[in-house]
A protein has these predicted regions:
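Acidic low-complexity intrinsically disordered regions
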Residues: 1-122, 126-127
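Loop/turn positions that initiate beta-strands
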Residues: 145-147, 219, 364
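P-loop NTP-binding catalytic core
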Residues: 154-224
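Hydrophobic positions on the alpha1 helix immediately C-terminal to the Walker A/P-loop
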Residues: 235, 239
């Protein structure tokens, strides 16, 4: 009995930290970091070794209710960790009257911790960004890629960023209307039913070629299979300019990943849509971030009934970047491709869809082949069956300077009958039957020749199947 009493009176050898001690441990580096910033010391922490003195200072610890005692720190600086240069606006009500704010706007990027930033440049962080508190994100139902307009205030004391005080509009919509928008993943996908017409008054044979051989509909998921030097960049620019000219209701996004800087500049000067790029001299993580920015912005627009087109160059390089950044799965395919690396690009490409009752997301991506890389071939095989439109460029035709170097037999669109009127569809099918009897070079040259001799596809299709007694018999394709 005495032994048990003695053991009960003896303190245990193990020590369990109490709440105050844990609080002290968390605040040590934070206090020193704040002191560094306050002293504007460029050489690091001058307060090393003073942590014990700070902890023993009277009145340092907090009361249970969270209010500081005499000598304690204010709410803004207490327990903020690496966010102590942000600001806490959680107590600001949505209907608070703002009298001295600044009008601002930006694209929202939400962090894993729940807070976010309005980016002036969607793909780059800068000191001009605007901090958005977690309470604002929850109150207004904000999502990644939202275009936010509102009132902000300048940073105070040690704060680094401007702070969002009030949200005036979300994607140019009233706040209450925006709260009712559906979630992209809950929208019902259907086959494309409305064609994106690429033919223009200018003599661009390639655009008329695509309209008849592999039409693109709103909500299409298309792949341009491109060997080196086959003209894919020129083709993408022409597609982009045709979309902006013929369909002003469509929001165009050109996404360039791992491309040459001069090609990025040329695309920005040639295309009227939004060009989002990450050149080859950027880190793979930046490539992935740029792709996320583009797809999230597109989803937000589709949710409110908009038609969006993303032209991606290329899904092959996007997959390469994913292979370098993904957590290794322990398995490796031929060419060094991790099977887990393909999931994120597939999720991007699979987002293309036509939405029932309005809105669509069209993605046309280039896939590189015949590069000499086994990984590129594996990536193409992974995406080959996922698209519902394929346009194959032929290296042999490009080497013979035949443009557009399109392989007619290997190109086409699934359910293209939904994209043509009945009368036009019959002519298109008849055209395909004629071209199917010819070789790759002969069929392409014949179609190019007939297109160049007619002012429009409508006039050209009138020639298809013309009777031998007609005046156009010698020129018909019957």
């Amino acid at each position: 009995g005495n032994e048990s009493d003695a053991s009960a009176a003896t303190p245990s050898a193990s020590y369990s930290a109490g709440p105050d001690d844990l609080n002290d441990r968390r605040e040590r580096p934070q206090r020193d970091d704040r002191r560094d910033r306050r002293n504007n010391n460029p050489n690091g922490n001058v307060n090393i070794g003073q942590g014990r003195e700070q902890r023993e200072r009277p009145g340092h610890r907090m009361r249970p209710g969270g209010a500081p005692t005499a000598g304690g720190r204010d709410k803004q600086q207490r327990g903020r960790g690496n966010r102590d240069h942000y600001m806490d606006l959680s107590d600001l009500e949505a209907d608070t009257e703002i009298t001295d704010g600044i009008d601002a706007e930006g694209m929202l990027e939400i962090h894993a911790d729940g807070f976010g930033f309005l980016r002036k440049k969607p793909t780059l962080a800068s000191s001009d960004d605007i901090y958005v508190s977690q309470s604002h994100v929850k109150r207004y139902g904000l999502r990644n890629g939202d275009l936010i307009k509102g009132i902000v205030r300048a940073p105070k004391d040690t704060e680094k960023y401007h702070g969002l005080l009030r949200v005036d509009s979300i994607n140019d919509l009233n706040i209450e209307v925006s709260k009712l928008r559906p979630n992209f993943d809950e929208l019902t996908p259907i086959y494309p039913e409305s064609r994106i017409r690429l033919e223009r008054e200018t003599k661009q044979v390639a655009m008329r070629f695509i309209d008849m051989i592999a039409p693109i509909g709103k909500g299409q998921r298309g792949i341009i299979v491109a060997p080196p030097k086959a003209g894919k960049t020129i083709l993408l620019k022409q597609i982009a300019n045709s979309i902006t000219a013929n369909h002003p209701e469509i929001t165009l996004i050109v996404l360039l990943i791992d491309e040459r800087p001069e090609e990025v500049t040329d695309m920005r000067r040639s295309v009227k849509g939004d060009v989002i790029a990450s050149p080859f001299d950027e880190q793979p993580e930046q490539h992935m971030k740029v792709a996320d920015v583009a797809i999230e912005r597109a989803k937000r627009l589709v949710e409110i009934g908009k038609d969006v087109v993303i032209l991606l160059d290329s899904i092959t390089r996007y997959s390469r970047a994913s292979n370098l950044t993904v957590t290794p799965s322990g398995r490796t395919l031929q060419g060094g491709l991790d099977p887990a690396a393909i999931y994120r690009p597939k999720r991007f490409f699979g987002a293309a869809r036509n939405i029932e009752h309005g809105g669509s997301l069209t993605i046309v991506a280039t896939a590189l082949v015949e590069t000499g890389s086994r990984m590129d071939d594996i990536i193409f095989e992974e995406f080959k069956g996922t698209g519902n439109m394929e346009l194959k460029l032929d290296r042999g035709l490009s080497e013979q300077r035949i443009y557009p170097a399109i392989d007619i037999k290997a190109s086409g669109t699934r359910h293209d009958e939904l994209l043509y009127p009945d009368a036009e569809l019959k002519k298109i099918w008849q055209l395909h039957r004629v071209l199917a009897n010819l070789g790759t070079k002969e069929s392409t040259e014949l179609l190019i020749d007939r297109i160049e001799k007619t002012p429009s596809n409508k006039d050209f299709l009138l020639m298809v199947g013309a009777k031998p007694t007609d005046a156009t018999a010698s020129k018909s394709m019957d």
